[in-house]
Each structure stands twice: as C-alpha cells, then as structure tokens.
Amino acid sequence: MQGPALRSPFRRWLPAIIALVVAVVAAGVLVLTSGESDDALVVYNGRSHYGGEEAFAAFTRETGIKVKLFGGDAQTLHDRLEGEGAKTKADLLVTVDGANLWRAKEEGLLMAIDSPTINEAIPAELRDADGMWTALSTRVRTPMRSTERVAADAVSSYEALGDPQWKRKLCLRSSTSIYNQSLVADLIAKRGATATETLLRTWMTNKPRILGNDIEVLNAINDGRCDVGLANHYYLVRQLSKNSSYRVAPAFPALSTAGVHANLSGAGVVSFTDRKAQAVKLLEFLVQREAQTAIAKQGEFPANPNVDPIKVVAAWGDVKLDPIDTEGAGKNATAAVKLMRKVGWN
C-alpha cells in the first residue's frame, strides 16, 4: 500500500536534510561518547581503521575525557588543518606515511612535547628527535611470493624482484600508489638516485603486470597470473583471515640486508591546541599496551616493541624493519615520482 504523500513543507526541506546527512557522513565525524561533546578532544584521524576506534574509546573509558574523531584521507586532513591554522578545533593529528609526519612538522602544524612515557615506550627510530610526533604502528612493503611455485629463499631482497627468472611473472601496483612512491623516495634517501634507478630498471625489464591495488597484486599471485610481487603486509593478513589456504606468503628481505621498508602511522599534538595536557595524555595512552594491542589487531606492527603483533604476523618469524627516513622521504617525494616515470613504471 502506498503511504501518504509527503507534506509540502517537508518536501521543500528534504533536499537540505539529505545534503546535511551526506555532509556529515563524508566528513567522517565520530563522537566516542554520549551527551554533549563541545569539550571533547578533537582528533583528525587519517588512519580510520584503528580497531573500530577501539583505542580511542578505551581512552575515554579510562580517563573520562571525551574524544571526537574527524576521519579522512591524510592529504585532505593535512590541507584542512593547514587551512584552518590557529582557528582549528583539532588537538591531535593522526596520519599515515612518515613523509606526511615530516611535512606536518615542517609546516608548523605540530608542537614539540617532552614525554618520558612516549620516550620509554617507543624506540628512538620511530619517533621525532624533536618530540613533534611518534609512530603508533608500522607497516612493511615487502616482496610477496607464491607458496606453490616459489621457494621460501628464492626472494630475499628487493633486488631479487629484478631477477630475469621473474620476467612476466612479477606483479606491481601502479606508480600512482603513495605506498610505492614512499618506498622509492626512501630508497633514494638511503641509496641515492643512481642506485635506486638501477634497481627499478631491473624490475621494469621483467615486464611487470601493473595492477590497481595491493589486493589485486596478491590475488594475481594466488591465482597463478604472477609468481612474485610487492605489497603491504597487512593486506595479506586480511586475505589470510578470509581464506587460510591463500597461496601467498611474504618474502621478507634477509636479516643480513638493511631490512624491509617500514612506513609509519603516527600522531602529534596540533600546535594550535589550547588543550595540550589532555592531548599529550591521549598520545601517551595510544603508545601503551591496551591501545597498542587494539591497533595491532588490524594486522600492523605495534610501534611499542613490548606489544606483540597478532598471531598470523608473529608466525612469520623475525622481521628486520628498516624504518622510513621521514625527512629524506619527504624531501625526495617529487624526485621519486619523476624517477618512476623515467623508468617506465606506469
């Protein structure tokens, strides 16, 4: 049965109501408490899957301090914070990619804090020397292999992906991926442009299949379209959680090498906040066991070395992390894109 027609006044305001709902959803606003939230700590959260925001909710339960999250991609939140300047409501910035943390520091968006709690919990290589930010988790961009067609020791370095035996059997994500751009920028910072170009050319000589995202790369290896590839490790965690028989495994660089490229998700106190003490308290909470355990559930490596990764990650054994050079990667971001184009990585 057809319901009664909408009354004219409601019909007149309906487009505005819909627009408002869409705007709220698009903004990614989440208040982790009931009641009024004007006094809530405001977090610009560019890492939206931290345990269903479990870590932030746990902070509210423990301290009584309310938290309001504004989600979005890292670039959008950075631009928003930069545009708002001193008028921003943000107290804490959570973002992805070490280069983004460096840029936020360089542009004066973060303030220095001196926290013995953070310094004790997080290794020096995973936090800013000036106290502007700290890592909350790390993710590695590692070679991947077929467990059916590739021996465990056949790929033990990034150089191994350029071995001629992988010609037309290598899968890579597009060069437009920020993950690939950050990897290359970090390689330039640590190895130099010439050595990095040589490495990338060996990959391109193998006529790699270029795909749209990391899941496509992993599926291509699983399905037999490729034998080896490159992907962030937590995407494999997700696939294995759906299918324990998934025929892909990480091929971490050998412990004798520099290690596997480890990028960061991290956070810093916004330089314009008038709630520094509460923001620091939240940041300190995020590096402790309860919050780090919640973050680790998403498959990333917790930044606090006293917190174990989840079982599927721990089962992979010892992994030597090579943390991103945040300043070097930030300064070489443009050079990385140009180099990838130069060698024909589309």
Regions found by a protein language model. Name each.
Residues A99-R103, N222, D227-V248:
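A ligand-binding cleft/hinge motif common to bilobed small-molecule-binding domains
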Residues M144-R149, A262-R275, A294-I295:
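A bilobed periplasmic-binding-protein/Venus flytrap-type ligand-binding module shared by bacterial periplasmic
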Residues T194-T196, A303-N346:
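An extracytoplasmic/periplasmic, membrane-proximal ligand-sensing/linker region
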Residues R139, R168-S175, L199-M204, I210-L211, S245-S271, F285-P309:
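Periplasmic-binding protein-like
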Residues M1-A40:
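Short, low-complexity disordered leader/linker segments with a strong preference
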Residues P15, V29-W102, N346:
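Early extracytoplasmic/lumenal segment of secretory-pathway proteins
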Residues G46-E53, G72-T76, T88-C226:
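Extracytoplasmic ligand-binding site segments that recognize negatively charged/polar headgroups
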